[in-house]
């Protein structure tokens, strides 16, 4: 079987073109959309990602300010910074970059982000709005998975989707988004017994657990679609996903590549959220 590569390049380009046009309209009105990137780590991979976000914002006409709190930042210090930026009308959007210091849990500080500026949908309020089916910003990676599947015309209504991973930033919100598309969703995790017995019955398998090569050809039925959300550092310094692509390719009908699949769409959606926040603030 020929496995179609579910790339995100075309979708990301279309999203970015629309975002750029809207950002330029805001700038023409006198005030550019502005994002605060809050960083509390010295992680090289995080630094690379933050730099890529800043470059993406610059290309699209979005002002982006990196605010470094240091790897020794406390929960109180992070919350104070988030509250200050939430109250500052100069900023339309806030993104708290992970990882956080070992002593700080995302759930303990994210509630300090104002919902109207929480463009990555990580606060308890944003996640609650999503669970209730109400308007709010959605975690961009979870949204990117759904948008990528739609872009490649993968049907979701009535289909069985197995989501491997239950984090608050991908797995859980993705399950909510898939339910809204009328999919039948099974969420698997580290305590799931016989993972392959579940995933091999699914029409779509989404791997979002952060373990390189966890999902293999044995986990996938012939003709299924596989979306790889993982970004793990390989021994050679490159990036690999949560899916063993070689064993899945030729068995799955479609497979998103790493890199080049979900990632570009996630960044594009984050930038679109920033502009949407700015548009709402401008009335």
From Swiss-Prot:
Keywords linked to the UniProt accession: Amino-acid biosynthesis, Histidine biosynthesis, Hydrolase, Methionine biosynthesis, Multifunctional enzyme, NADP, One-carbon metabolism, Oxidoreductase, Purine biosynthesis
Record-level GO BP terms: L-histidine biosynthetic process; methionine biosynthetic process; purine nucleotide biosynthetic process; tetrahydrofolate interconversion
GO cellular component, one term: cytosol
One protein family per Pfam: THF_DHG_CYH_C
CDD domains from the UniProt entry: NAD_bind_m-THF_DH_Cyclohyd
Recorded metabolic or biological pathway in which this protein acts: One-carbon metabolism; tetrahydrofolate interconversion
The keyword Ribonucleoprotein is assigned to this record: no
Chain residues that bind NADP(+): 165-167, 190, 231
E.C. no: 1.5.1.5, 3.5.4.9
Molecular function terms, GO-annotated: methenyltetrahydrofolate cyclohydrolase activity; methylenetetrahydrofolate dehydrogenase (NADP+) activity
Catalyses which reaction(s): (6R)-5,10-methylene-5,6,7,8-tetrahydrofolate + NADP(+) = (6R)-5,10-methenyltetrahydrofolate + NADPH; (6R)-5,10-methenyltetrahydrofolate + H2O = (6R)-10-formyltetrahydrofolate + H(+)
PANTHER family linked to this entry: C-1-TETRAHYDROFOLATE SYNTHASE, CYTOPLASMIC, C-1-TETRAHYDROFOLATE SYNTHASE, CYTOPLASMIC-RELATED
Family from the record: Belongs to the tetrahydrofolate dehydrogenase/cyclohydrolase family.
Subunit structure: Homodimer.
Function comment: Catalyzes the oxidation of 5,10-methylenetetrahydrofolate to 5,10-methenyltetrahydrofolate and then the hydrolysis of 5,10-methenyltetrahydrofolate to 10-formyltetrahydrofolate.
Name under which the protein is recorded: Bifunctional protein FolD
Species annotation: Nocardia farcinica (strain IFM 10152)
Top-level taxonomy: Bacteria, Bacillati, Actinomycetota, Actinomycetes, Mycobacteriales
């Amino acid at each position: 079987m020929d496995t179609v590569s579910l790339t995100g390049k075309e979708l990301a380009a279309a999203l970015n073109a629309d975002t750029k046009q809207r950002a330029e309209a805001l700038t023409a009105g006198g005030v550019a959309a502005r994002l605060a990137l809050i960083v509390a780590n010295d992680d090289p991979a995080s630094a690379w990602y933050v730099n890529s976000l800043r470059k993406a914002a610059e290309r699209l006409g979005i002002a982006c300010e990196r605010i470094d709190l240091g790897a020794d930042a406390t929960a109180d210090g992070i919350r104070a910074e988030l509250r200050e930026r939430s109250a500052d009308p100069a900023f339309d959007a806030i993104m708290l970059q992970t990882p956080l210091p070992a002593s700080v849990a995302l759930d303990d500080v994210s509630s300090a982000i104002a919902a109207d500026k929480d463009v990555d949908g990580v606060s308890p309020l944003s996640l609650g709005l999503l669970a209730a089916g109400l308007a709010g910003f959605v975690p961009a990676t979870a949204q990117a998975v759904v948008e990528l599947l739609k872009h490649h015309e993968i049907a979701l209504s009535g289909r069985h989707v197995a989501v491997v991973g239950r984090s608050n930033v991908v797995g859980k919100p993705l399950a909510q988004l898939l339910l809204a598309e009328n999919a039948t969703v099974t969420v698997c995790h580290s305590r799931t017994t016989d993972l392959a017995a579940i995933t091999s019955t699914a029409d779509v398998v989404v791997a979002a657990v952060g373990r390189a090569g966890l999902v293999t050809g044995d986990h996938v039925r012939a003709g299924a679609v596989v979306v790889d959300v993982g970004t793990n550092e390989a021994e050679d310094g490159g990036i690999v996903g949560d899916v063993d692509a070689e064993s899945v390719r030729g068995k799955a009908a479609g497979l998103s590549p790493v890199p080049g699949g979900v990632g570009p769409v996630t960044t594009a959606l984050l930038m679109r959220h920033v502009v949407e926040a700015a548009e709402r603030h401008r009335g």
